[in-house]
């Protein structure tokens, strides 16, 4: 689900280039889309806005503001949508700022997911992690594996 048509097309192109099969729909999370059967997916992937409303740096343009700051898409709304779309045992993968992990884990638990893997990314060895990659399983048992920190140089 992608709100911006240009970003949705980029997602489709990335799927094609990587030989992957997937469905990318342009629209709002709260809608009902016949092309997205409930419980029909093995994997849902999300790159939610990094910051709650009225926080974070001011974006230089409307497209970046939409991508960076929550509006209709909140972490909880993303988890609720993934819970409806994924089959039992299906995975939900997403990236977000590390300071939002507690909020994410609460939303995952409330929507029937168990976080299974976590990896933090650092821009350099001297700086704090600025991105968290999380994989959760719908209906999964407790047990989180924390992978080694990855340093992006």
Task: Label the model's feature ranges.
Residues 19-34:
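Conserved SAM-binding strand-loop segment of SAM-dependent methyltransferases
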Residues 11-12:
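Conserved SAM-binding loop
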Residues 43, 48-77:
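Mobile active-site "lid"/loop adjacent to the S-adenosyl-L-methionine
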Residues 71-133:
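Conserved Class I SAM-dependent methyltransferase catalytic core
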Residues 1:
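The conserved SAM/SAH-binding core of class I Rossmann-like methyltransferase domains
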Residues 125-153:
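Flexible, glycine-/basic-rich loop-and-beta segments that form/coincide
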């Amino acid at each position: 689900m992608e709100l911006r048509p240009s970003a949705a097309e980029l997602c489709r192109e990335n799927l094609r280039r990587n030989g992957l099969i997937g469905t990318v729909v342009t629209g709002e999370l709260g809608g009902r889309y016949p092309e997205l059967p409930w419980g029909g997916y093995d994997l849902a992937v999300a790159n939610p806005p990094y910051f709650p409303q009225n926080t974070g740096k001011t974006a230089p343009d409307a497209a970046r503001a939409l991508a960076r700051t929550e509006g209709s898409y909140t972490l909880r709304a993303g988890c609720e949508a993934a819970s409806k779309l994924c089959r039992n045992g299906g995975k939900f993968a997403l990236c977000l700022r590390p300071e939002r992990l507690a909020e994410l884990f609460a939303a995952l638990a409330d929507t029937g997911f168990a976080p299974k893997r976590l990896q933090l990314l650092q821009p350099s060895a001297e700086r704090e992690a600025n991105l968290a990659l999380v994989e959760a399983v719908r209906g999964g048992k407790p047990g989180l594996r924390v992978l080694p920190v990855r340093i992006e140089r």
